[in-house]
């Protein structure tokens, strides 16, 4: 019986040492230390041992079982710590993996076109000048050869703030402001918001314009045509036919409306171009001598040209959009396309 107990002890210790997982540890407990385990079976057999050996064998059996139970608890504690450390390690982020790309919005289509227009003119040597949205009547009208009661003022549905203060109806006031402070030669564009009391599928009360001005000696209409033709080919990324039609603007003389071949039909004639094959895109002309006199330039020495274009108009043609109001309705289905 004593030898049987020692054999069982050696077998149990060897089995416990080899255990590496909690599942195997539970199987060990049931096999050796459970109610129906091997040690329980041996303890029940002590009754058949000689009476004089029973106390010694019982004490030996209890000692072996107590030692195994202590070693069992140590093993369980060790495995529990290993499992906890492993879980902690697995829960840590892998810093070697690439990070998630943050969600970011896109620039508004009007902003994209505005930046593209400015970049094209900057590449031609034009500087960018910005001015106030709330303007004085003098710079918005009088300095541009549009005095009080001039019939040309009827062309502008103006938002007046108070007295002679108004929301600018075009970015042309920056021409006068820049020329007052800078001697020729100069090349500048003035991008920004403008305001007119008008709202339909092709007009909004607030929209964006870019005004351009070039002043130097011996500037001719041919220079104007060359600059604008190059710009239109670059902004629409194709060699579009361009034509200049006589027109009238108070601050330029001669003046012209600039048309391009319809981008919808390629100049063949469609509903958008009203079967003409042409689309009006901007206005331009040679700076009127009266404007030069207002800012102290000598019109006998210097000449120049000016032009103005609507950013929304460019964007509508560039992206084939038929309603200007889509730009300002904040519809993500529309804006996410750009």
From Swiss-Prot:
Query: So what does this thing catalyse?
Result: tRNA(Phe) + L-phenylalanine + ATP = L-phenylalanyl-tRNA(Phe) + AMP + diphosphate + H(+)
- Where, in this chain's numbering, is Mg(2+) bound? 253
Identify the coding gene.
Answer: pheS
Gene3D superfamilies found in the cross-reference section: Bira Bifunctional Protein, Domain 2
| Pfam families, per database record | Phe_tRNA-synt_N, tRNA-synt_2d
Q: What does the organism's lineage look like at the top?
A: Bacteria, Pseudomonadati, Thermodesulfobacteriota, Desulfobulbia, Desulfobulbales
Instruction: Provide the family line.
Output: Belongs to the class-II aminoacyl-tRNA synthetase family. Phe-tRNA synthetase alpha subunit type 1 subfamily.
What's a BP term from Gene Ontology annotated to this protein?
A: phenylalanyl-tRNA aminoacylation
Q: What is this protein called?
A: Phenylalanine--tRNA ligase alpha subunit
Region: Disordered; residue ranges are: 71-101
The scientific name of the source species is Desulfotalea psychrophila (strain LSv54 / DSM 12343)
Gene Ontology cellular component annotations, sorted alphabetically: cytoplasm
- How and how many cofactors are bound, per the record note? Binds 2 magnesium ions per tetramer.
This enzyme's EC code(s): 6.1.1.20
